[in-house]
Amino acid sequence: MSSGNAKIGHPAPNFKATAVMPDGQFKDISLSDYKGKYVVFFFYPLDFTFVCPTEIIAFSDRAEEFKKINCQVIGASVDSHFCHLAWINTPKKQGGLGPMNIPLVSDPKRTIAQDYGVLKADEGISFRGLFIIDDKGILRQITVNDLPVGRSVDETLRLVQAFQFTDKHGEVCPAGWKPGSDTIKPDVQKSKEYFSKQK
């Protein structure tokens, strides 16, 4: 599967953009700054909307879990960094984000969204794209939701853990795999060890 210039198994498109960092400061960051770490890079349509804060807060609240497995979560939308900051400074009870534990990237020229294939051109906003990029900068997973439905932090965390497991051990992860579950040796004979345990 490919999406814009984002192709599974290929280097993820690099970007350089201004982000609002967890300390509330503006900083120019690029994807290459995170080489050596896994990255969950997700797009959302707009600041000050309805589903978006639920997703962003959910990822931010669990940023430490991702950090523990050497993974950085980064959010992005087409809004300006000033708009991001205003939303962060708006209380949660008023639809704001409150303090963030993840950077929020500003993509006002829509070049990053276009590069990653998530730009909804007729509205100039991003679909809910999510990209898992490994520690070598290779794109491993793409999901894109239409605007009305949010994403699962649990599933994203599971996918990062599964890719990290396969990278380290060379075994493959069956459907619904979670850390500690059985994996499959990718060999006709050795795979029977896994399948023989199935009901």
UniProtKB/Swiss-Prot annotation:
Gene3D superfamilies: Glutaredoxin. GO terms for biological process: canonical NF-kappaB signal transduction; cell redox homeostasis; erythrocyte homeostasis; fibroblast proliferation; hydrogen peroxide catabolic process; natural killer cell activation; natural killer cell mediated cytotoxicity; regulation of non-canonical NF-kappaB signal transduction. There is a cross-link at K185 (Glycyl lysine isopeptide (Lys-Gly) (interchain with G-Cter in SUMO1)). The active site is at C52. Detected in heart and skeletal muscle (at protein level). The gene is PRDX1. It comes from Myotis lucifugus. Residues 6-165 form the Thioredoxin domain. The modification Phosphothreonine is found at T90. The modification N6-acetyllysine is found at K7, K16, K27, K35, K136, K197. This is Peroxiredoxin-1. PROSITE patterns: THIOREDOXIN_2. The keyword Ubl conjugation applies. Its main location: cytoplasm.
